[in-house]
């Protein structure tokens, strides 16, 4: 398999299988890449069985040369962490083309001594950090401190990240991971073309949405065998693209969810499937925000020791008993008209008249936002209603 992109994609689908069981007929949005990166920070300090389980769940065990290269003082092969750091630095560097804010941090109970070399390693490899707080004597103040940090990091978008009661005096360590994204399209949708139309949630139920429109040349794949089609919408940077996987039928989502896999997705989005076609594209405004307690998901995937008294985090702390108490992930994605270049009105008028094919996103679909250079899935989602 051999790469971070493949490992994060495989983890992405494992996670989706778990989430869809617990979130039937609900929107889903999460960032596999951001979850893998913060789990990798924990992984640096995990030892023995805890480490082996983590390696399997995040598919690091399949990365070529993973165990061999450079056993550094950070206790694991540096190559994986270096390539993750490169991808994350690339994606999170300030850009005019999109806003992406990431708030990822570990918070540990201050009575646990944290090894200075661990702090050094996560700083070098991830620009990451672990902060000690007093859960034992001031759990609610710790929660408020965490929430205000997440809010600041995401420019006020993600508020009240940890709910009251989510930490208590018994809390030992919390993994916090929140990510916000709003991109600028390579080709903008024009505000005046947006209209209110019904979005058909089921055969019986529909709700009004703001539907954007543009006509132009887009990469599209028709997957007749699966009764669905795929549209790629590039963001202005050229490095990120959104892929919309749209079933032909209103009720076709379940079949698509059952079929999708890492192999299928790479086949469907390969260059011999995706072709440039003139297309009228209708895409709804979207504002999807979800939050998950990842503890149950990760345990179900096989990462059991980390959250139990059997945890071995001796690379983080000399305390024998340290375990992860909670892992919380939140993702927020907004989809609007804004683009870097406006389509010229005359060109569009001519083109629209000559275009007969439509890609009309007016019923439930899957979508993903991909970092093309590393082939990594930054966001994966299911939209039941935008």
Swiss-Prot record:
Q: Which cellular component, as a GO term, is one annotated location? A: extracellular space
Sorted alphabetically, which SUPFAM superfamilies does this protein's record hold? Serpins
- InterPro entries (alphabetical): Serpin_CS (IPR023795), Serpin_dom (IPR023796), Serpin_fam (IPR000215), Serpin_sf (IPR036186), Serpin_sf_1 (IPR042178), Serpin_sf_2 (IPR042185)
Other known facts: Much lower abundance than corresponding protein in chicken egg white.
Gene3D superfamilies attached here?
Answer: Alpha-1-antitrypsin, domain 1, Antithrombin, subunit I, domain 2
What this protein is called in its record is: Ovalbumin
Q: Which residues are glycosylated?
A: 293
Tell where it localizes: Secreted
- The main location is secreted
Q: Which UniProt keywords are present, listed alphabetically?
A: Acetylation, Disulfide bond, Glycoprotein, Phosphoprotein, Secreted
Q: Where in the sequence is Phosphoserine found?
A: 69, 345
Instruction: Write out the GO MF terms.
Output: serine-type endopeptidase inhibitor activity
Family that this chain belongs to: Belongs to the serpin family. Ov-serpin subfamily.
User: From which domain of life does this come?
Assistant: Eukaryota
Functional description taken from the UniProt entry: Storage protein of egg white. Lacks protease inhibitory activity.
PTM-bearing positions, type N-acetylglycine = 2
